[in-house]
A protein has these predicted regions:
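Sec-dependent bacterial lipoprotein signal peptides
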Residues: 1-26
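Transition segment at domain starts
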Residues: 26-62
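Short, surface-exposed binding/anchoring microloops in extracellular/periplasmic proteins
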Residues: 55-76
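Exposed aromatic-hydrophobic patches
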Residues: 59, 102-108
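Noncatalytic modules at the cell exterior or secretory-pathway interfaces
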Residues: 66-72, 106-124
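Short, surface-exposed beta-strand/strand-loop-strand elements in extracellular ectodomains
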Residues: 78-95, 132
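Edge beta-strands of jelly-roll/beta-sandwich modules across compartments, strongly enriched
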Residues: 81, 119-134
Length: 134
């Protein structure tokens, strides 16, 4: 049986994080002092001056309704930022890149705890979006 040193497995992850491209951390926005509110029927995220971030961030949000509005107010200088929302049953109800100004709605989903996923790919700019029960 071949043994693999733990250090050898961790090295690529450490290098990626040092380069500012954390692929796995929910703290990827921490250096930019994000303001994140996840209250029943109201979710909001804002982070200013984000620079070259690649990450997937997941947030739980309680929606007592079956639909939601999604308001975009994001400024992108490079890269992409995408929001994907899944309902309490795991069905995808929304998937769109964040843009400077947009009022949008999700499709109908099951009430309960929804998942809001923010996918950043080499993103730089100011993130700002809100999701509210419709």
């Amino acid at each position: 049986m071949r043994q693999v040193r733990v250090e050898a497995l961790l090295l690529p992850m450490v290098i990626a994080c040092l380069l500012g491209i954390c692929l796995c951390s929910d703290n990827a926005l921490a250096p930019f002092q994000p303001e994140i509110t996840s209250a029943t029927d109201n979710f909001q995220l804002q982070a200013t001056g984000v620079k070259n971030r690649t990450a997937t961030l997941n947030y739980a949000w309680d929606n007592t309704g079956t639909r939601a509005t999604v308001n975009h107010s994001t400024t992108t200088t490079s890269g992409t930022a995408r929001v994907i929302i899944k309902d309490a049953g795991g069905a995808q109800v929304y998937d769109r890149a964040l843009v400077p100004s947009l009022g949008d709605t999700t499709t109908t989903g099951a009430p309960g705890t929804w998942t809001i996923r923010l996918e950043l790919d080499r993103y730089s700019g100011t993130l700002n979006f809100r999701v509210q029960k419709l």
